[in-house]
Amino acid sequence: MKKHLLTTVFAGILLVGCNSTKTASTKSTNDLAVVNPIETSLDLTKVTNDKVPVTINPGRFTTETVTYRLPRVVQGTYSVSDFGKYVDDFKALDYNGNELSTEKLDANSWTISNAVNLDKITYNVNDTFDIETTGGIGGEQPFSPSGTNIDEDNYVLNLHGFIGYFDSLKNSQYKLDVTAPATFVRTSALQETGVKSSEDGTALTSSYFAPRYFDITDNPMFYGKLDVEEFQVGDIKIVLSVYSPNNIHSAEKIKAVMEKMMQAQKTYLGDVNSTPRYDIYLYLAEQNETAPKGFGALEHHTSTVVVLPEAMPDEALAESMVDVVSHEFFHIVTPLSVHSEDVHYFDYDQPTFSKHLWMYEGVTEYFATLFQVDQGLVSEDEFYAKIMGKIKTSEGMNDAMSFTEMSENILVEPYAAQYVNVYQKGALIGMCIDILMREESNGNRGILSLMKELSLKYGKNKPFEDDNLITEITSMTYPSVGEFLQTYVVGTTPIDYNTFFDKVGLEITESQVKTNYIQNNGVLIFAPNRETMTIPFSDAVKDNSFWAENGVLPGDVLKYVDGKELSMSTAQEIITGMYMWQPGKEIEVKLDREGKEIVIKTTLTQSFTTGSKLQEKTNATDVQKALREAWLKG
């Protein structure tokens, strides 16, 4: 009913716009930019030199100058992306097709003079995928899942990379037309208002409606040779769109894994229904120079874009999708239903950030970890191992830094370097609050119930005041929760996790623990050398049983892995692949040991290291066991 109503209202607006003639001398108000949708278009049938032409038609301005911007920062990345860098041939045209004077203020902003005569803006957009040199967050290029792809078979349209906003029209509605070959499959959760075919039938133009610029940035699109599957999770329709350039992986096979996981998530969440549709966009990258290298995902309120290597085996891809998508799907709780004014009124040029990344990312990551044991997808020992991994990783960060201070200043050093800790210590903060609430309520309340209560109070259209959240949580829960937040989240005191584990009858011990082939219990066993641009093993390799048994020594330099040469530009892709190795796989690794080539050709065996292990106390009391049961299965 709401969709129909919006479509009807929008159609009425369009009729008004279409019946008015837009000229510089028009004195009526029905063509003013402030009352009309900004009409935008992308034409994928007219790509030239790997650039998509974009047209922006804003309506009539009454001011002499206007400023148009593409985002410097987009939500969810917590880093500078500068999407204006990828714009070429920027032109502002008057009603006669003549160019108006423009001034580029910075990488992302243009001021247009004589704006009362502005008819439209045109420019071309380069994509980001094929110029990436490294992956990850904080580099010269945007993190891959927030980036763009322009390829004859696939278009990743993170729309913040193509469409911008006027300073004076941030809350204006948008109309978007995307023209593409008729043979393309197209998916987006953005409200579609119509489809029109070209006269010769070779192209289709899909029209979309966005209530404001936020909805443009929050609704990515996939176009091209896609494999699409749909399934239902409660009242939520899940749309899975997969691009596998060599058809190695299918949406049907991935759907089976996603459906099982997301049904479990929905069971865990219960009555949280904050969106009728959720989209998963999976781009599987080839192993070549022009492929994206930043593997991971970027959440949107009702979708996620995932980038992973196409070469991953089925089992490894399934494991990665469970870990990545489970985290992103839980964002329908926060920030979709619970968020601050900084999120709700996000400034894409000079953003301010909430103090509460521990909640947005940390609690979300905690849910993505806890629900798997709650729903029987992993064993309790596997869950404990994941928690220990987060503790070990967080110990390598600045454990005495105020988490709220770090969150609020996440774009600048020394805080930016600590960003990864939101997924480690942030999740552990969520765990501690959960255990405290279970203890205080005799097992009846936990952090999920708190988030549901906050969601009911606020919801997606009502932001909370950032400075008041901790006080509010304290009043909604228990004094012990408020004291914890003030001491360990606002304050600089490191958390003693043993205090919390003891409440549920667990303890940390030293023993032989399983590890993978690039880490010892969460600690990387390589020491990358940027001066020599090589990746040697560190001293830690001596404590990794697989490599030690195969004669690898500290200082041995990785040269080739399964025939692929390792360099700084290929390192993330190759080492990510090594992280996914499983016992039984045949491998061939070539090392350089002081100029001598060392070849290791063998079958992987399980690797072990000496490390910390979280396990159940043999003398745990009935009270501790009951609290543990409520925590893990509540």
Predicted regions, residues:
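Positively charged n-region of N-terminal signal peptides that target proteins for export
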Residues: M1-H4
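C-terminal motif of bacterial Sec signal peptides marking the signal peptidase cleavage site
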Residues: L15-G17
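Bacterial signal peptide processing site
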Residues: N19-T21
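Early extracytoplasmic/domain-onset interaction patches
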Residues: T26-V73, N158
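N-terminal, post-signal-peptide region of Sec/Tat-exported proteins
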Residues: P58-D94
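Non-catalytic architectural context of zinc metalloproteases
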Residues: D82-D89, L93-T275, K293-G296
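Juxtacatalytic substrate-recognition/specificity segment
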Residues: D227-H356
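C-terminal recognition in membrane/secretory proteostasis and scaffolding
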Residues: A368-T369, L377-G634
